[in-house]
Amino acid sequence: MKFNVSSTELLKGLMDISKAIPAKSALPILENFLFDLKGNILEVTASDSELTLKTEIEVDTTEEEGRIAVPARHIIDLLKELPDQPVAISTANDSSIECKWTSGNSVLPFFPAEDYPEIKGTGDDAERVEFPADSLIEGINSTIYATADDEIRPAMNGIFFDFSPESTTLVASDSHKLICYTVKEVKTPEKCSFILHKKPAAVLKSILGREDGAVEIAFDSSTVLFTFGKTTMVCRLIVGKYPKYRDVIPQNNSSILKIDRAMFLNTVRRVAVCANKASNHIKLELKPGQMEITAQDLGFAIAAYEKISCDYSGDELTIGFKSTFLTEILANMSCETVVMKFADSRRAALIIPSEDDEESGKICGILMPIMV
């Protein structure tokens, strides 16, 4: 293998996929990048066996093609210290590569590409769909915080992608809160779905940040591929059945609170400072035209109270919530005005953007109350 490439371009490509490199692995070969040079394209692979990232880097000149595995940490650390300049990389012998730059060089070990595990993709029966990158990023951002850490029910540890002929909905829940994010322009001929674990979802979100086109998604019963720009992400899906989330969305909550989202969020945060740190319990007392928010920690003899104006219609209601859950939902909405719909103090509240907001119909949250 022998090629010349910009140090900056090589570093950028490696950093984009380095999130898949494990800190330590039962398979030490996975602590390496797999370099595959064909013509003037260097395909680089990083994997932890569950999550694989591939990218293509255009090199300036190629004198000898080849495939080798290169220590990820060493080559990244070296490139980080180099200013932007051409770098010549070549195999020096059967076990090492040489990196030459303007004023010096470095020798690193490499390992046979044959030792690198084969990365399997999807089968011939894979479903395929295009997803706008900005909508996918927003959908993951809007739901990932609601995923669970549940060893008994692994399906709850990921984001559920629910495709249909009408729309696509991303869903996440930890049994205390549930978030749905709907993208109406993404549709499939028939209903289909998959569950993406929160870890690859977070990686996908971070590397999608610079994309503004469409993401091609292909998936079967066990694997999903995301392709965008020069990058491909391959990961295993969570196998299992996701709960029937639509059945728990309240339909007839008749008591309605309409309030400025930022004001509500800031008030809850202030009052929650005095909430018990174990329960994070706050209490909302709702009456037409006003809402009182209180919290206390009897162990430390502290309490907080604040009254704010609001648009509320319905019976007077006293209801308790875990403040951290309520602030998470409010903070991850971008609407100006939020609507909360209640049935009573024991049943879940529905949290949605106001009907006149552009976010209306796109996102909804469901939050279980706690005993007052």
Predicted regions, residues:
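Structural preference for solvent-exposed beta-strand-turn elements
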Residues: 1-372
